[in-house]
């Protein structure tokens, strides 16, 4: 399945074609190659020790959240409605993958529910079942917003934190699922999945204002804050797709995997409830 989705090919191409163009710190790539037909892939990246690795289970501090939002905003601004996007046709877009994700969601919903039935909040269960017929419509809706490159899996487990004495302050890895779509989709994913509910409620508004302000400072125009907030809420609903498909396909049966799933479901449930996301679904 992973070969069919071309995840490894995309990551190798990202390090070769996109990483040299950006200011956002990524691990230095010493070698990368892929053979799609044989299913063989290799990527040799620099060792970032002794930098601190983010931990999705533990959750995000205010300082790390602020840094993560500022850095991804600058990355998004660099490709905002850029002509360079047309040359990156190997990166999937929201509209072109809408039907694929619709099918994957329906295919993986039952395996997902079977794995998490003991820890899935009832509100999230209802939304997950109702969302089964709405994935493509939500993704097509998001494709109408200004486009940039999304990381696609922007969360603490994919972040390495340095110090002022031994920088960079943030290095981002795991570029297997970049997407072309609304940048704030990365923000919705990060805030919903990485920040515990109480902390999110206290910091969410400020983080979104920070994200929008950095976009504007970097030259983004024609995108007002109300549009950003609308896309944020819709993107958060879309990310239920990511949870269902990933949990359905992958093995989270070890101790940390189980803790990760519980933490992410708890955070997602609170975010969905606070933002009343069920009202966004057609029908």
Give the positions of each predicted feature.
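All-alpha amphipathic helical-bundle segments outside canonical DNA-binding/catalytic cores
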Residues: 220-236, 268
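Generic recognition of stable, solvent-exposed alpha-helical segments in well-folded globular domains
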Residues: 10, 63, 67-70, 107, ...
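Conserved ATP-binding subdomain of kinase catalytic cores across diverse folds
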Residues: 1-104, 183-184, 199, 221, ...
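Active-site catalytic-loop/activation-segment of kinase and kinase-like phosphoryl-transfer enzymes
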Residues: 77, 87-138, 241-244
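ATP/Mg2+ or Mg2+-diphosphate-binding catalytic cores
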Residues: 234-283
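Short, flexible loop/turn elements at secondary-structure junctions
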Residues: 33-36, 47-49, 154, 163, ...
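Active-site activation/catalytic loop segments of kinase-like enzymes and analogous catalytic loops
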Residues: 13, 177-220, 236-256
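Active-site acidic catalytic loop and adjacent metal/ATP-binding pocket
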Residues: 134-183
């Amino acid at each position: 399945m992973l070969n069919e989705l071309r995840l490894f090919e995309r990551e190798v191409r990202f390090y070769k074609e996109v990483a040299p163009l950006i200011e956002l710190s990524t691990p230095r790539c010493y070698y990368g190659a892929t053979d799609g037909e044989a299913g063989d892939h290799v990527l040799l990246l620099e060792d970032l020790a002794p930098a601190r690795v983010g931990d999705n289970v533990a959750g995000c501090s205010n300082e790390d959240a602020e840094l993560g939002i500022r850095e991804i905003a600058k990355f998004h601004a660099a490709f905002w409605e850029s002509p360079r996007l047309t040359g990156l046709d190997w990166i999937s877009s929201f509209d072109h993958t809408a039907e694929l994700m619709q099918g994957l969601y329906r295919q993986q919903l039952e395996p997902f529910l079977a794995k998490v039935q003991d820890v899935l909040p009832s509100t999230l269960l209802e939304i997950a079942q109702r969302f089964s017929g709405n994935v493509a419509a939500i993704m097509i809706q998001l494709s109408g917003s200004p486009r940039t490159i999304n990381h696609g899996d922007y969360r603490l487990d994919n972040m390495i934190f340095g110090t002022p004495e031994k920088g960079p302050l943030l290095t981002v890895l795991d570029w297997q699922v970049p997407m072309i779509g609304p940048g704030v989709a990365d923000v919705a994913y990060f805030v919903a999945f990485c920040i515990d509910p109480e902390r999110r409620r206290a910091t969410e508004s400020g983080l979104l204002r920070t994200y929008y302000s950095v976009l504007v400072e970097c030259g983004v125009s024609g995108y007002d804050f109300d549009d950003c907030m609308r896309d944020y809420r819709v993107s958060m609903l879309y990310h239920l797709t990511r949870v269902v498909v990933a949990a359905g396909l992958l093995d989270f049966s070890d101790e940390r995997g189980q803790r990760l799933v519980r933490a992410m479901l708890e955070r997602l449930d609170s975010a969905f409830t606070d933002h009343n996301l069920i009202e966004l679904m057609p029908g």
